[in-house]
């Protein structure tokens, strides 16, 4: 539509949070999370020239959060989810991806996984290791750890081993092709180890 050509919609992202899982700080609430959201907006502007606007949604109710994002989504070309607790972040992301016809990214999953895989690829190049025949061990299967393991599988890492204090956290990754193991075995057998909380 002309709105994408004649307005800033196509060059904008809404950064949505409820402050329920801010890195290193935990559940600090929506207002206290604002400096982190403003920092993300600065990164978008400085590095890629995208206009990003923090949107603080003061609720832990998943339906209210999703409906709020849906109602204001026409304002933005993309949706960036930030610092939302597990498992709520998965449900919110899935609901928005089903309902919106625009990019939806959960930074704590996709952003972290992308930069982690990039670092691993570059490290392997520097030391002459073939990542596709290597064994990667992922310790911790929260939002970031699960996404790192999934992206490593999609990229074609030789074998992805996973472990977590929660046995239930391993099951979806085993379904996706990872090998569940214990911490001692992972540390002994993995060529590359990534640990997340």
At which residue positions do the language-model features occur?
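Glycine-rich phosphate/diphosphate-binding loop of Rossmann-like nucleotide-binding domains
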Residues: 23, 30-45, 100, 110-197
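Acidic side chains
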Residues: 18, 83, 106-108, 164, ...
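Short acidic loop-to-helix transition motifs that present clustered carboxylates
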Residues: 59-65, 86-89, 109-113, 168-169, ...
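A local structural micro-motif
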Residues: 52-53, 105, 160, 181
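N-terminal ligand-binding/catalytic initiation module
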Residues: 1-104
